[in-house]
Curated annotation (Swiss-Prot):
CDD domains on file: Anticodon_Ia_Leu_BEm
Catalysis performed (reactions): tRNA(Leu) + L-leucine + ATP = L-leucyl-tRNA(Leu) + AMP + diphosphate
Keyword Nucleotide-binding attached: yes
Organism, as annotated: Streptomyces griseus subsp. griseus (strain JCM 4626 / CBS 651.72 / NBRC 13350 / KCC S-0626 / ISP 5235)
Keywords: Aminoacyl-tRNA synthetase, ATP-binding, Cytoplasm, Ligase, Nucleotide-binding, Protein biosynthesis
InterPro entries cross-referenced by the UniProt entry: aa-tRNA-synth_I_CS (IPR001412), Leu-tRNA-ligase (IPR002302), Leu_tRNA-synth_edit (IPR025709), M/V/L/I-tRNA-synth_anticd-bd (IPR013155), Methionyl/Leucyl_tRNA_Synth (IPR015413), Rossmann-like_a/b/a_fold (IPR014729), tRNAsynth_Ia_anticodon-bd (IPR009080), Val/Leu/Ile-tRNA-synth_edit (IPR009008)
Family: Belongs to the class-I aminoacyl-tRNA synthetase family.
Enzyme Commission number: 6.1.1.4
UniProt cross-references to Pfam families, sorted A to Z: Anticodon_1, tRNA-synt_1_2, tRNA-synt_1g
Top-level taxonomic group: Bacteria
Name of the protein: Leucine--tRNA ligase
Keyword Repressor: no
Gene Ontology BP, a term: leucyl-tRNA aminoacylation
Length: 957
């Protein structure tokens, strides 16, 4: 028989069992729903409620909302949800108005791929998955305000996702004001002449297409032809953040190639400095802040112009402008748009054969090399390959400080995604440039004095000398000399010279690239954009939102051979001609016109960029969010100067994806005056992972963990020895344990306790089903201390508890309260267990005052049993909004403490004393102790060191 179905239970009909837990939990979940127990009142609007509750200090607690996958939840998924629920319950009991709810992030590739696999429409499968997950989550007893729940696929929700896109599209970043402004204000500047157009023509003289192109250079959301990450195996393009370090798609592990396609982008780079600087005011783990700082990648240097006779100039960004005199060639990324403008019709006379790649003309060489480079990922291109590849463009540029002509190459180790996509090559002092120069027999010049004994002739070197701790040499022209200067001073001098001569200036560069925002998928938010017959993009008016997804016969993305870098994407929406081609009156005075809809969709990150705002005012169909409601829950306040959610819990894997994107959207909305909070999440907490053992047979295939037997330290499945490693939990690994199984066997409260007791919340830990019973027994003992298992009657008495019990109780109250506030739930459970064990050991019926406070202590952790016991103790109201117990300091302090007395560093006595004893009193007691007197043996005392109440150290004469 199992632990939950023993003969003993038959003899004790009112014992706390799995069956009783199921009954209790179902009843109280129904009660909470019926009573709206977890409904948090807004200060105004349709969700306003109890003014007394709304007047309390507020707490907005959020989880990263789940994808509704077809597999449902395993026990690892609810770890964070249970933790935030425990924390939220404690905050309610300590006088806060707590907003805690949960929605679903239901658009995007995961849901679409599941739908494709099962042959059902994404909406049908996604909604079915959500219903299943709602049942699973409700079973856990999570205290969510369900009035505020939604899914990102709800048209009422993505109407506002589209609306936000239009705000971003219709905005530009004013670098002088350091904020976003409406694009109409920029147009006004062009119209009145306070801002000149690039070619000096008046705004009215520009064609509609020219105006659109010019504004596109400023808009915070814009479409452009640019190199993107194209995954033929997925049939879509990917953001940089969705590509793994080895150049493959994060989802599906397909090869990713560079392809030049027209795509929508978000100008997140305009906010790079603010995204970086505002991290300092956030209460986030330092590891996450570091990841964002590195991803944004701020570096100081200079922009330098290298003139090209036939095409203006090539601009480079360098952090080592001090080495300009050593630049002997240049390299452009193969995709650089300057390449076409500089290549001559024929190779210049005397071109080195190794530079041409064996091609008859520069154009042929460039075309062939570009095709070769396109088949590589960025990671492959930047790998330290033994053989450096590239080709001469046939063009020369002029080094602006030396006046020398330097050849211009293209090579795949230079990327368009950093700096300007062009570099000045200083081979004597850069490892990659050194290797390239050796491969192509290019000249090198030493301009930094080596600190070793290699000399100053790079032709004799085995590698580059790249130290910063050295002086400049060979770095002078008729106007400036850097010789003898250190790197820092040389940088400052040459930067000043470049600016004076109009060939460069000091600048800051960022690793961060603009956010690729379009996907060739069906299951995403449609763009509220249409194109006229001239190809000019027009925003839909707000009255036409939401633009809903149309029905299509085939919603699968068209995928290709994963290795086919030449394949071109095809969007599912483009197959619905009736939806794509429309006649609309956009209200711009042009009347009804024919338009073509944008057929890309938004990425799965779009809906999660602003969902915290929708939780605040979920039924508002007039505006994004009521300003007074947003100010109440998320506005700036003392200690939170940029506002935001009070606590946001989720995985660390979203450091440079969701978290960065959401910060960007918040800043745009803040700049435009729509919200008061400049940051979405003030405090971030990353929970650890619940791991599980994975068992694999000799072929490396996972076998069901539940069917594995252990014999003499080895593991067997169906008689075959298998290996065991600790890893993730999941359906594909055949080691998933569902919360449904544990709830059926022990109850939801036991599952909650076990997950919180496994270890510190931010540390990963292995799941062990066999250990769950420990928390089940805790609840059984706690129940038994309040309820008679034979009769079901409450056994408490109205008497005062003894001194020992009061001390145990108040120490537990003090410790549990601190642990709850600090999210140290494992140690809180340990303290509750210690108190319950004390009460069990003491025997006899509990004092009512002790029993009630014991129930209140366990209530945030195990709310169902707490509600049941609270009701049985005679209370008609819910335990949820009761005050959390407050410890009496008099009982928290120990009655006596042990003081160690040392003589010459050796312990000679231990004294039981009051913790309030003074140094003088303690010294007198120690010197009078018989053991101390005997140990001194009549010797005099040179010194007594007292550290009351724990230590006395005696130094004999």
């Amino acid at each position: 028989m199992s632990e939950t179905n023993s003969a003993a239970e038959t003899a004790a009909p009112h014992r706390y069992t799995a069956a009783m837990a199921a009954d209790i939990e179902a009843r109280w979940q129904d009660f909470w729903d019926a009573e709206g127990t977890y409904e948090a009142p807004n200060p105004t609007g349709d969700l306003a409620g109890d003014p007394e509750l709304a007047a309390r200090p507020k707490k907005f607690i959020m989880d990263m909302f789940p994808y509704p996958s077809g597999a449902g939840l395993h026990v690892g998924h609810p770890l964070g949800y249970i933790a935030t629920d425990v924390y939220a319950r404690h905050q309610r009991m300590t006088g806060h108005n707590v907003l805690h709810t949960l929605g679903f992030d239901a658009f995007g590739l995961p849901a679409e791929q599941y739908a494709v696999q099962t042959g059902t429409h994404p909406r049908v499968s996604t909604e079915a998955n959500m219903e299943n997950m709602k049942v699973q989550l409700r079973r856990l007893g999570l205290g969510h305000d369900n009035r505020r729940s939604f899914a990102t696929i709800d048209s009422e929700y993505y109407k506002w996702t589209q609306w936000i896109f239009l705000q971003i599209f219709n905005s530009w970043y004013d670098s002088e004001a350091d904020r976003a402004r409406p694009i109409a204000e920029l147009v006004e500047q062009f119209e009145n002449g306070t801002r000149a157009t690039p070619d000096g023509r008046e705004w009215g003289a520009l064609s509609a297409a020219e105006r659109a192109d010019l504004l596109s250079e400023y808009r915070l959301a814009y479409a452009s032809d640019a190199p993107v990450n194209w995954s033929p195996g997925l049939g879509t393009v990917l953001a940089n953040e969705e590509v793994t370090a080895d150049g493959r798609s994060e989802r599906g592990n397909f090869p990713v190639f560079k392809a030049k396609l027209r795509q929508w982008n978000m100008r997140i780079t305009a906010y790079a400095d603010r995204l970086l600087n505002d991290l300092d005011g956030l209460d986030w783990p330092e590891a996450i802040k570091l990841q964002q700082r590195n991803w944004i990648g701020r570096s100081e240097g200079a922009r330098v112009e290298f003139p090209v006779d036939t095409a203006g100039g090539i601009t480079v960004f360098t952090t080592r402008q001090d080495t300009l005199f050593g630049a002997t060639y240049m390299v452009l990324a193969p995709e650089h748009d300057m390449v076409e403008r500089i290549i001559p019709a024929a190779w210049p006379e005397g071109t080195h054969p190794v530079w041409t790649g064996g091609h008859a003309s520069p154009a042929e060489a460039v075309t062939a090399y570009r095709k070769q480079a396109a088949a590589k990922s960025d990671v492959e291109r930047q790998a330290e390959a033994k053989d450096k590849t590239g080709v001469f463009t046939g063009a020369y540029a002029t080094n602006p400080v030396s006046g020398e002509k330097v050849p211009v190459f293209i090579a795949d180790y230079v990327l368009m995604g950093y700096g300007t996509g062009a570099i000045m090559a200083v081979p004597a002092h850069d490892a990659r440039d050194f290797a390239f120069a050796r491969a192509f027999e290019l000249p090198m010049r030493c301009v930094v004095q080596p600190s070793d004994d290699r000399g100053t002739d790079p032709a004799t070197w085995d590698d580059a000398f790249s130290s910063y701790d050295a002086k400049l040499v060979n770095s002078a022209n008729d106007e400036i000399s850097l010789d003898g200067l250190g790197v820092v001073e040389a940088k400052a001098r040459i930067t000043e010279w470049l600016k004076e001569h109009g060939v460069g200036e000091g600048t800051v560069n960022f690793r961060l690239r603009d956010w690729l925002f379009s996907r060739q998928r069906y299951w995403g938010e449609p763009f509220p954009i249409v194109y006229d017959e001239d190809g000019i993009a027009h925003p839909l008016p707000e009255s036409m939102l939401p633009l809903e997804l149309p029905e299509v016969e085939d919603y699968s993305p068209r995928t290709f051979d994963p290795e086919d870098a030449t394949a071109q994407p095809e969007t599912p929406l483009s197959r619905n001609a009736d939806w794509v081609n429309v006649t609309l009156d956009l209200g711009d005075g042009a009347g009804p016109r024919k338009y073509r809809r944008e057929t890309n969709t938004m990425p799965n990150w779009a809906g999660s960029c602003w969902y915290e705002l929708r939780y605040l005012d979920p039924n508002n169909d007039r505006q994004l969010v009521d300003p007074s409601i947003e100010q109440y829950w998320m506005g700036p306040r003392e200690g939170q100067p940029t506002g935001g959610v009070d606590l946001y819990v989720g995985g660390a894997e979203h450091a440079v994806l969701h978290l960065l994107y959401a910060r960007f959207w918040s800043k745009v909305l803040h700049d435009l005056g729509h919200i008061s909070s400049a940051e979405p999440f003030h405090k971030l907490y990353n929970q650890g992972m619940i791991q599980a053992f994975v068992y694999r047979d000799s072929r490396g295939i996972a076998v069901p963990a539940a069917e594995v037997e252990e014999r003499d330290g080895a593991f067997y499945h169906a008689g075959e020895k298998v290996s065991r490693v600790l890893g993730k939990m999941g359906k594909s690994l055949k080691n998933a344990v569902t919360p449904d199984e544990i709830c059926a066997e022990y109850g939801a409260d036991t599952l909650r306790l076990y997950e919180m007791a496994m270890g510190p919340l931010d540390v990963s830990r292995p799941w062990d089903t066999r250990a769950v019973v420990g928390q089940y027994r805790l609840l059984q003992r706690l129940w038994r201390n309040v309820v008679d298992e034979a009769t079901g009657e409450v056994t408490v008495v109205d008497t005062e508890p003894d001194e020992d019990t009061l001390r145990a109780l108040h120490k537990a109250i003090d410790g549990v309260g601190q642990d709850m506030a600090g999210m140290r739930f494992n140690t809180a459970i340990a303290k509750v267990t210690e108190l319950n064990n004390h009460l069990t050991k003491a025997g006899g019926p509990l004092s009512r005052s002790v029993a009630e406070r014991l129930v209140l202590l366990i209530a945030p952790l195990a709310p169902h049993i707490a509600e049941e016991l609270w009701r049985r103790l005679g209370h008609a109201d819910s335990v949820v909004h009761q005050d959390f117990p407050v410890a009496d300091p008099a009982y928290v302090v120990d009655e006596t403490v042990t003081c160690v007395v040392q003589i010459k560093g050796k312990v000679r006595a231990r004294l039981e004393i009051s913790p309030a004893i003074t140094d003088e009193e303690l010294e007198a007691l120690a010197l009078a102790d018989e053991a101390v007197v005997a140990a001194l043996g009549g010797a005099g005392i040179r010194k007594v060191i007292v550290r009351a109440p724990k230590l006395v150290n005696i130094v004999p004469a």
